[in-house]
Amino acid sequence: MIRRPYLLLLASLAATPTPGQDTRPANFDYPETDRRMETLLEFPEIKGDISVVMSCVSRIKANGRMDGTGCYMQNNYDQPFMQAIGKAAKKARMNPAIVAGKTREIFLQFRVEFIQKDEQQTIDYYLNPGWEENVKAYGFRHVAGQRVIGRNEPWNAACPKRAKWSLWVRSYLGPDGRAESPTIQHTNGIMPTETCLNAIRQTIVNSFYTPTFADGEAVPSTFIEPFSN
């Protein structure tokens, strides 16, 4: 017997929590059920009892299309799960984010949990990347902040194009959807120039966001986003 419940962080489109009538985070509850991740994502053929959580990112277009979806691999065992998510994301659609009354392209960080036990399979979805401080404060099912991707972000022109680099940017995100005090942690490759780092800080501070939500309320949170080439 195969059971595949789909657990949404947002109960329904009508019940989606917002700080105002003109703001809504992107969510998986797309009206056409055959285009949802829950319909398209297939559980990989794996033997035995398993529990795997994949941390993923995607650019959610204003039309709900998922673009550039990728997941972090901890080891080779994660590969079939990463491939399954990538395959489903190519066809899936999401309800796009709404900021200031307009649908906007956003950077989404989410997790997918695959559980197989006693021949039963479940796939759970979390609209947050699982940062410890936010999970401790708001639980596993909070909806993390989502950053609007601008057309001409400063870092695109200021940062290296060829030499590989990657870093994390950590900032405070208020319930009003404003980011403050970004700090940068270098993670791999070359260390970008200060011009690049300042451009990234400028991008974070000047961007629009949907705030983090917990129990239907906009709340302050830690916002962390990876940057790389």
Give names to the regions the model predicted.
Residues 18-229:
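Charge-biased low-complexity segments
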Residues 10-19:
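Hydrophobic h-region of N-terminal signal peptides that target proteins for export
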